[in-house]
Swiss-Prot record:
Residues 198-209, 475-487, 526-542 have a biased composition (Basic and acidic residues). It comes from Mus musculus. PANTHER family: RAFTLIN, RAFTLIN-RELATED. It is a lipid-anchor. Involved in protein trafficking via association with clathrin and AP2 complex. Upon bacterial lipopolysaccharide stimulation, mediates internalization of TLR4 to endosomes in dendritic cells and macrophages, and internalization of poly(I:C) to TLR3-positive endosomes in myeloid dendritic cells and epithelial cells; resulting in activation of TICAM1-mediated signaling and subsequent IFNB1 production. Involved in T-cell antigen receptor-mediated signaling by regulating tyrosine kinase LCK localization, T-cell dependent antibody production and cytokine secretion. Belongs to the raftlin family. This is Raftlin.
Length: 554
């Protein structure tokens, strides 16, 4: 009572783990002819002394990645995205997660043929763009786009760009790597914003709060292609409860202390000791083995809203689909995204420009241009030490069955530390799929929606059959009546021959054609024509009265 506590932010406003899409969920889960298969490789450029107890594959440099992925390329996979777990920044102190990378590979399959598509194989190539020192960030982008377009003119397909700052070198020649947090104050600086002492519960998703479509995200894939060492079993992400976070006790942090230079003191004095910083830019391309076409790439600048607490980034937000949907509808494919925080203001809220690189529609394919639908996922990746416990791979595998292709993963410099020592970082995942064919709808009457199209067609068919059967029945009766009239007229015309009269039973009528005359066997009918015939031939009447001749009797 009497305590003036700050109001907690609404979870709907700052709740991570959100999914944004141009479609509704039933349309997102509509199966198409194409499916995808994903696998990934986690690797690091740090040595075992710098990063002990890690299952990540160790590479001497990013230049060794094409050789490392050669076996997967021979199996039909190709690189789809490449990113560090944490976005590198211009800070002098570097953290371990900036030097741990993930490469996601994809293989396309055809659902209808139940066979893999091998129409276009690739080889992975790397281009070392530049090693820049004290160059403004906004000047890097035009130079990089020019490099990408030059490679595209040679038939290469751009995949990803990885900017990497070289680690700081001390006077003893060893690299100094800053842990995520080495004190209670550092942990609070990472997780608390100015004037807000709320817990990580407001910024870290729980399984019960996220959308149903992200329910599978909090599961770790069982296999890790290309990884070395034993991977510890997956556990719960370790996201603390509100009571645990609000306790005023100490934060026992573990798992991310560097192995070297632990006695050099607080690394926050780095800017004075090491004013010189270099950044290396590596660009990765897929070269098609068979057909090579010239691709066009263009940049799109999107404003990103950054919240900072001192030099620590606490949040990063943007209206993703608002700025990208128009490019998706016109057939643009997102390939990669880069941004630097040097353009952001030093105030609490600042804006920085994110540069998103799109592949334009080829001029050769203008006649078959089709738009794309998109999904954007704001995903929190949780790590225990350096081992991933929660990430986007389960969600990616579930969407692969519906033909969604991963195009880009944008890491952020956001880091939050929990009481258990786990670290969570925010990553933005982009997926695309060709638009579903639009069904043409006919204008129907007001109440036609009660019946399906098949039921309406069946009712119309039965109705037409009923009308047809009634008309056929009437026509058959008329034909039968006309036929009886024709028989009656044919029996009254011609010569009549009487055999032995048998009046006690019905006579048998047979029609026999001899030339053009009609002969009727049996008793002739009593009509006016037959009477007129008897009176007009008296000789025939006399013969009939005399009876049959002997010759006829025989």
């Amino acid at each position: 009572m009497g305590c003036s506590l700050n109001k907690l932010e609404k979870r709907e406003e700052k709740r991570p783990g959100n999914i944004y899409s141009t479609l509704k969920r039933p349309q997102v889960e509509t199966k198409v002819d194409v499916t995808y298969e994903y696998c990934f490789l986690e690797f690091t450029t740090l040595t075992a002394a710098e990063l002990p107890r890690s299952s990540a594959t160790r590479l001497a440099s990013l230049r060794d990645l094409p050789d490392q992925l050669l076996e997967l390329y021979q199996q039909g996979f190709s690189l789809a995205a490449l990113h560090p777990f944490v976005q590198p920044t211009r800070r002098q102190e570097k953290i371990l997660l900036e030097h741990i990378f993930r490469a996601i590979l994809v293989k396309k399959t055809n659902r209808s043929q139940k066979a893999e598509l091998h129409d276009e194989g690739y080889t992975l190539e790397l281009d070392y763009c530049s090693s820049l020192e004290h160059l403004a960030d906004q000047k890097l982008i035009p130079e990089f786009i020019k490099k990408v377009q030059e490679a595209a003119s040679q038939g290469l397909k751009f995949v990803s760009v990885v900017p990497q700052y070289q680690p700081s070198v001390s006077s003893a020649g060893s690299r100094r790597l800053k842990p995520v947090a080495n004190s209670v104050e550092d942990a609070r600086d990472v997780k608390c914003t100015l004037g807000d002492r709320s817990s990580l519960e407001n910024d870290t998703p729980k399984a019960a709060e996220t959308d149903a479509a992200t329910a599978g995200v909090n599961r770790r894939p069982e296999t890790k292609p290309g990884s070395t060492g034993d991977v510890p079993s997956a556990q719960q992400p370790g996201i603390p409860s509100p009571s645990a976070e609000n306790e005023a006790g100490e934060f026992p942090l573990r798992g991310l202390q560097p192995a070297l230079d632990r006695s050099e003191g607080d690394p926050s004095n780095g800017p004075e000791e090491l004013p010189s910083r270099k950044m290396e830019i590596f660009a990765f391309f897929n070269r098609p083995k068979s057909q090579q076409k010239c691709r066009q790439y263009y940049p799109v600048t999107i404003p990103l809203q950054v919240s900072k607490n001192g030099q620590t980034v606490s949040s990063l937000d943007a209206s993703w689909l608002e700025h990208m949907s128009d490019h998706f509808r016109k057939g643009g494919v997102l390939v990669n995204a880069v941004f630097q925080l040097g353009m952001a203001n030093d105030s609490f809220y600042g804006l920085t420009d994110g540069v998103f690189i799109f592949e334009a529609v080829s001029t050769e394919d203008n006649r078959t241009t089709q738009g794309y639908d998109a999904i954007v996922v704001e995903q929190w990746t949780v790590l225990e030490g350096t081992e991933v416990q929660t990430d986007y791979m389960p969600l990616l595998n579930s969407l692969a069955a519906y033909g969604w292709q991963l195009t880009c993963v944008l890491p952020t410099p956001i880091l939050k530390t929990t009481r258990e020592g786990n670290v969570s970082t925010k990553q933005i995942v982009f997926l695309q799929r060709p638009c579903l064919p639009q069904k043409t709808k006919k204008r129907e009457s007001k109440f036609q929606w009660r019946f399906s199209r098949n039921e309406i067609h069946g009712r119309q068919t039965r109705k037409s059959k009923g009308k047809l059967s009634a008309s056929n029945k009437q026509q058959a009766e008329e034909n039968e009546k006309n036929l009886e009239d024709q028989f009656s007229k044919a029996g009254d015309v011609g010569n009549c021959v009487l055999g032995a009269p048998q009046w006690g039973r019905a006579s048998e009528v047979r029609e026999q054609r001899q030339g053009s005359a009609a002969v009727q066997n049996g008793p002739a009918g009593h009509n006016r024509d037959s009477v007129a015939l008897r009176h007009s031939n008296p000789r025939a009447e006399a013969e009939l009265a005399a009876g049959p001749t002997p010759t006829e009797a025989n």
